[in-house]
Amino acid sequence: MGRVGIICLIMLVQGCADGADLPPLEDARELVVLTRNTPTTYYFDGDRASGFDYALTRQFAQQHNMKLRIKVAFSLPELFSMLENGEGHVAVAGLSQSPGRDARFAASIPYLHQQALVVYKSGESRPRSLSDLMARDLVVVAGSAHVEMLTHLQASLPELTWREVHAADSLEVMQLVSEGLAELTIVDSVEFDIQQRLFPRLVAALELGNTTPVVWYLPKDAASEPALDKVNRFLAAAKQSGDLAHLERLHFGQFEHASRLGSLTFQRKMRSELPQWQSLMAQVAREYQMDWRLLAAMAYQESHWDPSATSHTGVRGMMMLTQVTAEELGVDDRTDAGESLRGGARFFKDLLRRLPADIAQPDRTSMALAAYTIGMGHLEDARVLTEKSGGDPHLWPDVRAHLPKLQNPDIFPMTRFGFAEGNQAVTYVDNIRHYEGILTLESLPTSRLSPPIEVDALLPEHLRGTPLPVL
């Protein structure tokens, strides 16, 4: 490496060693958040930053007129080391509150609660009690609160052992169990509920301990009290206003009707059938300004990606259109995949447009999906029933709870449009959202951030392990 290259490398190293002089949170114009690159916290969906914790911290920054800067740690020990070294104002990464962490850092009020779950692979020996964890190959994420839990349990169960996987997250330890490279792991319920869609053979065997609060952690120093107060006021207001619940729905959703068998079948089809249709779906989705994964999930729910599918009721094609609907949408050949996808996308976008303007996402898409399968009139009946029962007709979870009433013989005769398969509509929407979630998660491993290069290894031998001069 030439002298110019070494100088550039030195500048790069020094550029990364920032954070020691961060202004206090209450005075800062930029919020520096330390987090992890995981599906439940922070990730890139294409070129767009996303994730529940990212969205929550962005909301904090916007409310306080601050810029947001994200710094990613590649392990939990590194995350807390960065916080201890003053490299960020807060650590926000789905962090369970624990005595060990509380001794080192200041914890906010909880913004979620989660349960530690012992996870195994279906078909293998299921652990039914804590004693069943002994003499098993148990893996956990290094630096996690689960290590603290196990260390505490080891006092009464001295034969309990485990392996700690470094620079990993729950997705990776779940993959180890799924691939038979470990027997058991421990994963928090929030992450398990989302990530099980990628590993449908994995099952929660038992709960470990009580539910634990999920908190933001701040440095424990003289400046932490006003900063902690600022964070706590924000989190309390987000709970009270419903903003927190809205973000939970947006990022975690509801998947009550999704079966493990359905997930396995979907994943097999995703590998065998989807590749031949993906580019066409992406093109149609671009034409109609949709996410291709939503369109693909709809097409799978309708026909399992079979362009020649036909039902006993006469609906046909990839999007299972009726003859009447196809004619209204200008679809000449329902068995032509491109025509069918365009017809379905056009119909869905029209339903999305016709919904009241004050229905926000993600509820808007879920309601349009329900209308796609039972009709806008029946959806409106369910919204009216929701409002009459004291629910919010703008929120999908509330409307979802009332859709089955359209089958109740004591209720549907009094609605404007009468009987409808409300239970079927609920399952339809849940399945599509579930399949869309799998497609989203499948795209994440290729877009996850890579750990930093070990710069020391690139330096000439006489410069390794020595402080670099300031230029």
Predicted regions and their residues:
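Extended ligand-binding regions for polar small-molecule ligands
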Residues: A17, G51-Q63, S122-H146, S189-D193, ...
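Extracytoplasmic small-molecule ligand-binding "clamshell" domains
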Residues: D18-L95, P99, A103, R163-A167
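Bilobed "Venus flytrap"/periplasmic-binding protein-like clamshell domains
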Residues: V32-T41, D45-Q62, S96, L117-D169, ...
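Periplasmic-binding protein-like
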Residues: T35-T38, P110-G123, S189, D193-R233, ...
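A ligand-binding cleft/hinge motif common to bilobed small-molecule-binding domains
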Residues: V92-R104, T151-H152, Q175-N210, E380-D381, ...
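Substrate-binding/active-site groove segments that recognize
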Residues: A142, S308-D332, A337-D350, N408, ...
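Export/targeting segments at the very N-terminus of extracytoplasmic proteins
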Residues: F255-W305, G338, L355-I359, L444
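Catalytic and substrate-binding regions of cell-wall glycan-acting enzymes that process beta-1,4-linked
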Residues: M367-I438
